[in-house]
């Protein structure tokens, strides 16, 4: 039988694991239950969550049973890594609705090309809400080491900088450890999966299971997806645009374009992390790439096609492919009215202008520009094209001939930003 752990290591999908020899042994002996938790702290997962999700899917493909724990309770607390802001606690009023949305996203991905796979989705609110404080502190709290929590890097940093740490934050580690104890006791779970920043929480859970249930259990962490500045890609950091899995928040076209623009040095790492293309095929592609038998765009397209298909399905992928072809590889004179209607449903930016709006107004109102000063700057720098013709007048007003089929105008800003104007009959 294929060595699943070695396959995951070959793909650089494992950061740490607690006991490789025994994990391999138990996976050979039987099909196991393993789990990963996802806290519903927003109304969608983002691409950073794809690594652990697809990790679970790989186990599912080998016949093991993934258990997804939606953190309906732990999301109300947050851990030391989550940045707080004024609206932080306010957002959690929506946790119940967010939990359902995230559950549907997870189902679509885990069941991709395998509707019959076994999958269990639970919400830790169901068992944590039943806890009695005295029983919990007496039966569980006595096994949790505050010494270990204080040794966490994020805690040491906060203490050194004299930052406030609430009891609520400490409780997060206790409750996450309790999840593992509960799941081992009631669902026979043997492995917990988490991002590399969750290592200490996973170890706390393992210790708790060992001490109370007297069972040997394990943990595996996956690498984190980081931003260009090295920080963890997450919804709490708005320095760079977050790529969400919900097409209402990040359109399928934007999602597809994100992967099409993957830097050359990350293409093959991402093919290993995010696709089910075999390692032998990836290595062949890599050889062709370095021998210049295929160009970077061809490799990027394979990556974008595969990930978009997994997350959004084949029909949405086809739509994103067609929109990309129309916008980048066809002359605007070659586009039919049907092509424009297709573009209008593809997920590119759409704006319905008023008849008295000039170019600056439209750039700002369509969110192609942040302000009128910014709009003026991009116009004067020759960065704006209207129906593929450069426009340098800051007071330009749209005329009848700018409205293709008396309905559409395509604005392009720079090399990659588009907005389709759809004119109403005034």
UniProtKB/Swiss-Prot annotation:
S4 RNA-binding domain mapped to chain residues: 357-414
Family of the protein in this entry: Belongs to the class-I aminoacyl-tRNA synthetase family. TyrS type 1 subfamily.
The protein's Enzyme Commission number: 6.1.1.1
Localization of this protein: Cytoplasm
GO CC field: cytosol
Record-level GO BP terms: tyrosyl-tRNA aminoacylation
NCBIfam families documented for this protein: tyrS
Top EC class for this record: ligase
Function: Catalyzes the attachment of tyrosine to tRNA(Tyr) in a two-step reaction: tyrosine is first activated by ATP to form Tyr-AMP and then transferred to the acceptor end of tRNA(Tyr).
Protein's UniProt name: Tyrosine--tRNA ligase
Family matches, as PANTHER family: TYROSINE--TRNA LIGASE, MITOCHONDRIAL (PTHR11766:SF0), TYROSYL-TRNA SYNTHETASE (PTHR11766)
Reactions mediated catalytically: tRNA(Tyr) + L-tyrosine + ATP = L-tyrosyl-tRNA(Tyr) + AMP + diphosphate + H(+)
Binding residue positions for ATP: 235
Motif ('HIGH' region): 40-49
InterPro entries: aa-tRNA-synth_I_CS, aa-tRNA-synth_Ic, Rossmann-like_a/b/a_fold, S4_RNA-bd_sf, SYY-like_C, Tyr-tRNA-ligase, Tyr-tRNA-ligase_bac-type, Tyr-tRNA-ligase_bac_1
This protein's encoding gene: tyrS
A molecular function (GO) term: tyrosine-tRNA ligase activity
Binding site for L-tyrosine: 35, 172, 176
Disulphide-bridged cysteine pairs: none
Motif ('KMSKS' region): 232-236
Domain of life: Bacteria
Subunit structure: Homodimer.
Key words, A-Z: Aminoacyl-tRNA synthetase, ATP-binding, Cytoplasm, Ligase, Nucleotide-binding, Protein biosynthesis, RNA-binding
